[in-house]
Amino acid sequence: MSDTDTKPSGQDGGDQKDGEYIKLKVIGQDNSEIHFKVKMTTHLKKLKESYSQRQGVHMSTLRFLFEGQRISDNHTPKELGMEDEDVIEVYQEQTGGLRNN
């Protein structure tokens, strides 16, 4: 289905950077953890979609953060400097906050 559920093919030569897989831990506001195995060059939209589907929540209502910075759909783990066992935090979008009297 997606790179989050596949295993390395083993065809990597000496330089494995682009085909390298890392494990990422996605932690929700309720401290639930879901682990993903992704390629360094996979767009993180796939991970976000998979997480949202597993949680039964629409992706647009969630915010994904890595080291305090919001993750966009076209980011890759390689671009963000992610390493094996890094953590992505997920927060429910909050709107409003202004109260009219």
Curated annotation (Swiss-Prot):
Keywords attached to this entry: Cell membrane, Cytoplasm, Isopeptide bond, Membrane, Nucleus, Ubl conjugation pathway
UniProt entry tagged with the keyword Thylakoid: no
Disulfide bridge partners, by residue number: none
Gene Ontology biological process terms from the UniProt entry: protein sumoylation
Propiece span(s): 98-101
Protein's job: Ubiquitin-like protein that can be covalently attached to proteins as a monomer or a lysine-linked polymer. Covalent attachment via an isopeptide bond to its substrates requires prior activation by the E1 complex sae1-sae2 and linkage to the E2 enzyme ube2i. This post-translational modification on lysine residues of proteins plays a crucial role in a number of cellular processes such as nuclear transport, DNA replication and repair, mitosis and signal transduction.
Name of the molecule in the record: Small ubiquitin-related modifier 1
Organism per entry: Oncorhynchus mykiss (Rainbow trout)
